[in-house]
Amino acid sequence: MKFNYPETRRDDSVFDIFKSTEKGSVKVYDPYRHLEDQQSPETKKWVDEENKITRSFLDQDNTSEKISNEIMKMLNFERFDWFRRRGSKLFFSRNPNTLNQNIIYLIDIDQISISKDGKSSAKGFENAIEFLNPNTYSKDGTWSLKSFVISKSGDHVCFSYSKAGSDWEEIAVKKIITTNELKTNKDDEEEKEDLKKKNCLHYAVVDLPDSINWCKFTSIKWDENETGFIYNRYPKPEKVSDDDKGTETDTNLNNKVYYHKLGDANESFDRVVFECPENPQWIFGTEFSHDHSSLFISAFRDCNVEHNLYVIRNFQEAIANKSAFKVEALIDNFDACYYYITNTKQGEYFFLTNLSAPFNRLISIQLNDDQPIVPNSKSKLEFKEIIPEKDYVLESVSRSSQEKFYVSYQKHVQDIIEVYDFNGKYLKDIKLPGPGSASLSATEYHDHIFINFSNLVSPSVTYYMDSKNDELLLFKEPHIEGFKSSDYECKQVFYESPKDKTKIPMFIAYKKTTDITSGNAPTYMTGYGGFNISYTQSFSIRNIYFLNKFNGIFVIANIRGGGEYGKAWHEAGSKKNKQNCFDDFIGAAEYLIKENYTNQNKLAVRGGSNGGLLMGAISNQRPDLFKCVVADVGVMDMLRFHLHTIGSNWVSDYGRSDNPDDFDVLIKYSPLNNVPKDSNQYPSIMLCTGDHDDRVIPAHSYKFISELQYQLGKKVDTPLLIRVDKDSGHGAGKGLSKQNNEIADIFNFFSKVLNVKLNF
């Protein structure tokens, strides 16, 4: 098929001069910088023209529509995402079938009956009331829930939401009361009767008038008396309206921690609790101590986990008396991470840290009320080791009311859970159903623990555990018509990275009837390799669809740069070592071909965000190896990423181009700056982005595809396409219909490029 790509305006007068350690001053041209102006009529017209070209390729037939319909049919089953108990109330997230967004429900815990033999799902959920339904706010699913924070009693809930996929959040508040507290007008009487019929102990939900705007990556925590809450936000950007949130490219600076008192209408009334104007790029996280006597504030200067730690021990007094908050620096030299876990009445405070422990450990610090705090840079704090570092990664620590620690570890990218007492004595392992991923939900206020477990071929199942006996019981499992986990296989292999021979883990999933030895199986491989994030197993009905429809193989390459093996593994794929990520991924492809799983003509790869950068880099470096590439919301311009929205925080992984040493690394792999100019070979590629992505702004993809089409559009016959989704952002919270349309287009792209005939 011949492609008539749009004639994108190229301005060769735009350039920057960078300082290079290797070459002195270097001039780098940036002819498509005008595409960074997302709101310009020229850019909008260009987007429409590019989308038209992409649709002309995808819509040669109705394959996308057929795939979308089939996947939607497979998704037509009841599924539960999470359960959280507060007081006597149980909140849970449920999608009854194919709604764009999950609904949040509420029920009294006493109305749930759990099977004593642990072999069948709990019952009583039909009595739950609808607490929050995002689908009522937008028909197309572009209103999405970002955070959901329940107070200790369960009587109040703060939730934040976003629109059109933007990272900007707004905060709203709901209150839960009994129907006896409702005022007795006609409508309320009808509501009371309806609730009685549902036999739901007469809970009712009241919307409070509080509304807070211009939050991003916010950390919300309720105060002790539930009269207000802590959160953090940025100043409102100067040149953007509420309707255009997510389309601006301004750098996000001057994050502050605020206190909001219930009843105050909006953020203009809120009190600043903590700020650091001399370090405007810092972002803050907050956590109240177990007894709410202290507020801990973590200050992050970038995306590294290492942070400073501050404590306010007079928080309640300062709120009650409207006096000043006394901020004390506990950690002030970014030497490690210190995540607060809990504390005892005797003043022993527990923290998860990587201090002298790249795989992490649990320590405690003694903080007495009458003891002044001297920061660690000036006085060596006395750390007591509770759980020593092991040779596998400590991921998280939770506690229950029984004063036990439930410690989640990751060993070779498989989750295990161990139980310890507060002295660090090992008690037992929690026996999980098998290899896979487990997420644990517990609080110190009750004995109930919920564990979600899944892997690539097993749907997410929720288990319940009483911390008095730590017995794992089935709580809720999905029923997917026609699906059996036993029909599929998932195995883990280890291969050598081609240059330095580092062993890299990789998951391979396929249907047992698939021939994985002929070297001809259609293969869909993905990876991430960044920001200390581990790419763990999770179940996806869409991936199962690929295994079935393509008779194919799905692969996760756990390349360096992630958190799979702790700090050293992350650093081995960051900054000057970033090339290791690309080499590892290239090595994964070579392994699959060498071991006769697939061949170059049947290999499709996909990655998003930092994984989108991975796709751009490997396409430039090994265009002969990959037949089909899909890059979602990728970071493609490595010389300018730090100048837009939250990009300045990514320098922890990438470095920055105004540093001569970093420039010499970035210029060698930046996808935008390394498009081959004289090649007659390049993978079929489709970039996917959203016009409201304010994390990795769409200009990264706009500029990269423009350069590809300019340099190679008339030299190669492979498609060089971009799919720009309207009213979409970086991906989080995307509605089911948008997700489905996107994956249908991607699988359609796979089938056409890999020459796989799909039978419908």
Curated annotation (Swiss-Prot):
Q: Name one GO cellular component term.
A: cytosol
Q: Where are the active-site residues found?
A: 609, 693, 730
A GO BP annotation: regulation of signal transduction
Query: Which Pfam families does this one have?
Result: Peptidase_S9, Peptidase_S9_N
Q: Which SUPFAM superfamilies match?
A: alpha/beta-Hydrolases, Peptidase/esterase 'gauge' domain
**What InterPro entries does the database record attribute to this sequence?**
AB_hydrolase_fold (IPR029058), Pept_S9_AS (IPR002471), Pept_S9A_N (IPR023302), Peptidase_S9_cat (IPR001375), Peptidase_S9A (IPR002470), Prolyl_oligopep/macrocyclase (IPR051167)
Q: Which enzyme class?
A: hydrolase
Knockout or disruption consequences: Resistance to lithium due to elevation of inositol (1,4,5) trisphosphate.
Molecular function terms from GO: oligopeptidase activity; serine-type endopeptidase activity
EC annotation from Swiss-Prot or TrEMBL? 3.4.21.26
Q: How is its activity regulated?
A: Inhibited by chymostatin, Boc-Glu(NHO-Bz)-Pyrrolidide, Z-Pro-L-prolinal dimethyacetal and the peptide H-H-L-P-P-P-V-OH.
Under the heading PROSITE patterns, the entry gives: PRO_ENDOPEP_SER (PS00708)
Quote the Gene3D superfamilies the UniProt record gives. alpha/beta hydrolase (3.40.50.1820), Prolyl oligopeptidase, N-terminal domain (2.130.10.120)
Could you tell me where this protein is found in the cell? Cytoplasm
Question: Keywords for this entry?
Answer: Cytoplasm, Hydrolase, Protease, Serine protease
The reaction(s) catalysed by this protein are: Hydrolysis of Pro-|-Xaa >> Ala-|-Xaa in oligopeptides
Q: Which PANTHER family match?
A: PROLYL ENDOPEPTIDASE
Q: Which family does it belong to?
A: Belongs to the peptidase S9A family.
Annotated function: Cleaves peptide bonds on the C-terminal side of prolyl residues within peptides that are up to approximately 30 amino acids long.
Protein name per the record: Prolyl endopeptidase
Tell me which species this is from.
Answer: Dictyostelium discoideum (Social amoeba)
